[in-house]
Amino acid sequence: MTEKKVTGVLQSDWSAVIQDYPIASGWTRDGGALVVCDSAGGVYVFYAKVGELLWSERCAHEGGALAMSMHPVETGFTTAGQDGKILIWDLSEARPRCCIEIGSGWVENLLWSPDGAQLASSHGREIQIFAADGTEQWRSAEHLSTVSALGWLNSEEVVSTCYGRVTIFDAATGEHNERFEWKGSLVSLALSPDGDVIACGSQDNSVHFWRRSTGEDSMMSGYPGKPTALAFDSTGTLLATGGGEAVTVWSFEGNGPEGTYPGSLELHERAISTLSFAPDGLTLASGGRDGLVFVWSLQSDGQGRPEGAAMLESVLAEVCWRPDGKALAALDGDGVVTVWKVS
């Protein structure tokens, strides 16, 4: 029994088991299918209505999968792994329609642009940009260290992080549009929907963020651990952060968050491992190393209350909202995929 208790707005729907620790998941745009990849290199496609496994490829990436990105416009998705390959999949076929050979080295980050025209990836100290058909468009010079995260500010600008630096590239040319320096190791990245705020969790147990419109930067310190989980809501008003047992929520309303007190959501018994806002509104899902999942209703000042909860057997690897916000998927360390309806 992997699901011990469900309360509030969460209603049990279905669950399934994959062969190894889950790496990432994603819903198709219409919510009709859920795709999951695992650390053994497996790819699984589930019919989301009932949890039926439509198809799987257990050894898609030799050595294991490391990243996955759903196409934002079409029904396909892309995976990458330790084998130095990027695979572009069509949902209707249990085989990739395109294989990009990076060569030696792990492909650790992967993300489609918002318009689906370009694919960004990173391996080691370099990032590469590909067209939708897999043709390489450009690659960066080596970063100062291994690229830790990628993000798209919009369809024209892509962001990378590494030790000591955030770099904004022109997606068409690879030219540097802007750089932000910080003496520390940046371990996570979240971008506000309007592209103005770049937030990073740091190895020194702080959250650092920059505003492009003003050039100002700020640091929020005092976390008991590394803030590896960050998430903005769809309006850019709230930034939810991990870094301990509590979810710390900073409000960018008015002149915040500088000089304000954050909201603190305190129900988890162990460190936060994953955070995700619903597509619309101020509803947040949190998962922790305690196997607990909570759904929170937040206010614009960052304060909130729990609306639903579920207990699983193992650490939460990821929580992922269906595009309509009416279902939530969770992946736990035992390889269990759990889906709840959200009322």
Segments predicted by a language model, with ranges:
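WD40-repeat beta-propeller superdomains and closely related acidic/aromatic-rich repeat-like regions
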Residues: 1-343
